[in-house]
Structure formats: structure tokens, C-alpha cells
Amino acid sequence: MTKYKQRKRNLYNDNPDTYALSRSKIDMFLDCPRCFYLDRKLGFSQPSMPGWPLNSAVDHLLKREFDHYRKLQQPHPIMVQYGIEAVPFLHPDLPIWRDDVYHYVGASVVEEQTGFQVQGIIDDIWVSPQGELHIVDYKATSTASEISLEDEYKQAYKRQMEIYQWIFRRIGFKVSPVGYFVFANALKDRTFFENKLEFELTILSHYGDDSWVSPTLFEMKKVLECDTLPDANPECEYCEYRRLIKEVE
């Protein structure tokens, strides 16, 4: 296990020309301003989590499958099944946007008023006959329940998509408010494993509203320019853990 250390790089200072800010850091700020400040200003990151190799494998295979139809400029059969009039978007920057090059940046744009370079790694983009882009995100899951976007934790999925929509509009693309989630649901009703998982694909649409993104960036800027810790979110498990530990030390 890696020894935990205070990070000295990629810290915010009061007068940066630009400061890189990933989509996940925006979500961290919304979850808990204090954790965000500790991470970006003081270099105390939240404890790391293990990766999700099975989810990554699903993403990789879905990208390969949709790339086949991208080359043909034809809709994937499931797009036809759901009546989606679009094809996978063919663009020379797609490998950068979805980080096939492993630079850990993705699509990015600078918000001029804050100096934040907002970054996000997408899974896919589809384009309509009218030239509108649809942001697409792949999600791997395993549930016997109906696939939906109404669970509490899936609100973060919606914010994720809306940030991507915001980025691509700022880059200069015509972006549809309608994005798509492609859920790959691993089925557990099989009798035996037989060295394979079987998945069922479901597409859910989300009508995004990115009007909250810029105001949130302004609030993040204010927090980072303060010299005092912001209040913790009472619902933050990390902060509550630290508080309870202090009580018994």
C-alpha cells in the first residue's frame, strides 16, 4: 500500500493563468466544499479507491463495437432499436476526448472568467442528421431492478453528462440537450457462470441543463481564494469520519 502523503503538485494558487479542473473535482465540490478545498488548495486528497477493471473492460468493448459502426457511418443496431436517429460521431479528436491516448485530460476548455481549464473524459458522441451532438456515457451495472436514472447516486451521472455538454458547447459544437446513457446490465439469472458474463443493453435518455455549471465554477473560485476552510457538508462521510475520530483520540 502506498504511504499517504500531502500532495505538493497541482495545487491552486491565487493567481494562476489557468488551473486544470476535472469533472470529478466539480462533483467533489458539490458533494463537500471542505473536501474539495483540502484536496485542491492544501493537497490532502481523499483516500484512493481501487479501480473498476470489469467496468473498464465493458467500456473498452463497447467503444470497440461502436467504433465498428463509426467507420461505416451507420447506427448501431441498438440505436435503431430505440429509434435514435444518429450515428457514432467521426472526428479526429475523438481519441483525445475519450483519452485513448492516456493523457488523463479528455475534452477541455478554459472558462475565461475563472481561469479554470475544465476537463472531462467522455465515452462516446453520436451525431444527428442535423449535425447536433449527443453526449453518450456507458455504465456497467448488475441489477434485477428496472434500469432508471432516479436513484440518488445517479444524479451524479446527470451532472456528469451536463458538464460534458457544457464543455462541448464551449468548444464550439452544436450540442443537443438530449444525451444518452448506455447501461450494460450483467445478468445474474443464469444457472452457471461458464467463464462468461452475459449483458443486456438498455439506453436511457437525459435532457440536460448545464446552466448550473458556470455559477458553480464561480463559487469554486471563491472558495479556493479564501484562506479558511469552508464548512463541511453535514452528509459528507469523509468529514464525519474525521470528526468522530477526533472525539476518541
Each model region followed by its residue ranges:
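Short cysteine/histidine-rich zinc-coordinating motifs and their immediately flanking basic loops
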Residues: 43-44, 247-249
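Short, polar/flexible loop-turn hinges at active-site or ligand-entry regions and domain interfaces
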Residues: 48-50, 148-151, 227
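Surface-exposed helix-capping loop/turn segments at secondary-structure junctions
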Residues: 75-78, 170-177, 222-231
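Catalytic phosphate/metal-binding cores of nucleic-acid and nucleotide-processing enzymes, i.e., regions
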Residues: 49, 180-182, 239, 246
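Cys/His-rich metal-chelating microdomains
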Residues: 35, 242-245
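Mg2+/Mn2+-dependent nuclease catalytic core
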Residues: 100-215
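Metal-dependent nuclease catalytic cores that hydrolyze phosphodiester bonds in DNA/RNA
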Residues: 1-132
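Polybasic (Lys/Arg-rich)
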Residues: 202-242
